[in-house]
Amino acid sequence: MPLRARTRSRTARSLAVAATATALAATGLALPFAATATAAPAPAAAPLTSDFDGDGYDDLFVGVPSGTVDGKAKAGYVSVVFGGENGPGPHSVRRITQATVEVPGTPETGDRFGGSVVAAHVDDDKYADLVIGAPGEDIDAKTDAGSVTVLYGTGDGFALANTAARGAKSGDVYGNSLAAADFTGDTDVDLAIGGKDQVVANFNPLAADTRPVMADRMGGRAPVLTTGDFDTDGLPDLALGYYTQNQPYTQSHIRLYGWNKDEGSMANFWNSSNGAANALASGDFNGDGYDDLALGNCREIADENIDDPCGPEQLTKGGGIHIRFGGANGSFGWEQQTFNQDTAGMPGVAETGDGFGDALAVADIDADGHDDLIAGAPGEAIGSAAKAGSVTALKGGEMGLLDPAGAANAGTVAYQQNSPGILGVAQAGDLFGGAVAFGDHNGDGVPDLSVAAPGENSSAGGVWDLPGAKAGGSVVTPNSLGLPASSDPLAYGAVLGK
């Protein structure tokens, strides 16, 4: 769910897994969304979402599917950096592979264990559990069938694990993407699993039992997944985005699926065709109590001439973000907003290749009752450094992420590695903002922002932790964590857990 510092109680939402030149002036990073005298009252802190050891701190977790394990290239692993009073850091780190005692399977070349990761409370205890996709896993003679593993959190970090999904045939690549939520309303967490040309669900992750949600030609690409209550029935729904290319036509889709208790399955209840998105995220950006859907780097990908599926065409330059607002009585999507870096009040300038919205994350940073949106632009140029990358923190308000005049709300700011208080230097190819996520890593009740730069240091990668989504904090890299050398670039942070 979007992480809230303090907010009213609302329907639970789960965050999913989920990913070339412009000039951006250096931006100071004071707390972007300072609370005002009119801020909403603050009843309680949000529950921790990725506290695997139950110590009161959310933990940072990163899939490294290109990692070498026991000499096996791209066998893959997951790096868990435990939170603490000063945030995540090398003080407590766990590297999880298929050679780890608790984990089923064996490291093999090309397994890509850690290809997707998500946190979920599968077994109903106080510890978050780690769900891991391995889309390259071979199952018996079935090549690249893929698998999903649930590793259970304990007071000592992790204990037992079980397989929650196995691909049924070669090329299924189960675990290409993941989302977790209680879709059925039975209080138990369910999993949505992206594979090749299909999405399946497991309504009992304690066993490897999957059921189809949808199947379509996706050209081998991983579907983008997130969750939110878009039909206002009190249950989380599944949002998925994908596009086909020359199979036989090029077309793109956003689809919503909700639980149909009469049929005992997920049912499609809303579609938008020909508007592709590189990222999806849900949140209540206008504070009306209904979940909204953000489509990152939304643009038309279609052979047909469809009018503006992502809003005004000029706002797709450099990457546009399109918001479909929730509402009562089946009115989801009727109200919309679209913006890019050329929108008034937005830091930066929209240029081709920016990738604005390639990564999204949601939290109510200032606890005013309106969710705020973080948008990564990994292709952003900083000065002459192409693809150095940036992130923009967009403040939610009564009208959503724009004010009545159509400008970005006051307090919207940009972050990049040349900004005061941000560690490091913006360099070509860093891809800062390639992935973003929230977690309360220092336990103060305020969402902390994680920003990945998978191209940092010749694609070794790194993750920045910004406490309270402001300047300062720390950086973790493969070198600082003591991760082993790999035959392939690690691109640490490209698969950033939520």
Task: Name what the model sees in each region.
Residues P2-R6, T11-L48, F82-R112, T149-V173, ...:
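Blade-edge motifs of beta-propeller repeat domains
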Residues G355-V362, D368-L373, A393, G429-G468, ...:
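Extracellular low-complexity, Gly/Ser/Thr-rich intrinsically disordered linkers
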Residues G54-G63, D124-P135, G185-G194, T232-G241, ...:
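Acidic/hydrophobic-patterned starts of short beta strands in beta-sheet-rich repeat architectures
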Residues Y57, F61, T109-D123, Y127-E137, ...:
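Mobile, glycine-rich extracellular loop/lid and propeptide segments
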Residues A73-Y77, P90, D129, K142-S147, ...:
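A detector of repeated loop/turn-to-beta-strand junctions in beta-rich toroidal repeat architectures
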Residues P43-D58, G63, G114-Y127, G175-F183, ...:
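Beta-propeller blade termini
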Residues S66-G71, G136-A141, Q198-V199, Y243-P248, ...:
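Short glycine/acidic-enriched loop and turn motifs that connect beta-strands
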Residues L60-V62, V78-V81, I96, F113, ...:
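Hydrophobic strand positions within the blades of repeat-based beta-sheet folds
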